Amino acid sequence: MIYVVATTKVKPEGRAAFIDGAKTCIGETHKEKGCISYELHASVNDPDIFVFVERWETREDLTAHGRAPHLKAWRELSAPLKASPTEIEIISGGEVQKL
C-alpha cells in the first residue's frame, strides 16, 4: 500500500475556489483503479492550509493517477490559488520520499 500526504497553503482569496476544485478532483479520483481513499483535510490552526491524504494499492496506480486528465486539470486550476508550492510525501514500506 502506498500513502501520499500533500500539504498546500492557499491564498486566502482562493480558498473557496480551491475547495470547489478539489471536490471535483476527489470525485474523479475515487473512480480510479487502485484508489483506496483520497481525502482533503483543512488545518484546524490555519484555514489556508489543506492536506490531501491518499491511499493507493500500488505504486503503478499512483503513477497512473499522476497522468489522469482530471488531475492535470486540477493542477492547472489550483496553481494560481496557492500561496506556496505543495509539499508531497510518499510513504511506502516504512520509507518516506519527499518530492
Give names to the regions the model predicted.
Residues 3-9, 15, 19, 23, ...:
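Generic alpha-helical hydrophobic packing signal
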Residues 14-37, 70-74:
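Short amphipathic alpha-helical segments
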Residues 2-9, 39-66:
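Short, well-ordered beta-strand segments in beta-rich or mixed alpha/beta enzyme
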Residues 21, 41, 65-68, 77:
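Residue-level signal for well-ordered alpha-helical positions
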Residues 7, 23, 27, 63, ...:
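Solvent-exposed, non-membrane alpha-helical residues enriched in polar/charged side chains
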Residues 13-14, 83:
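PAS/GAF/H-NOX family sensory domains and closely associated sensor/linker modules
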Residues 8, 29, 86:
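Ser/Thr-centric signal marking residues that sit
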Residues 40-48, 74-99:
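Glycine-rich beta-strand-turn "strand-cap" elements at beta-sheet edges
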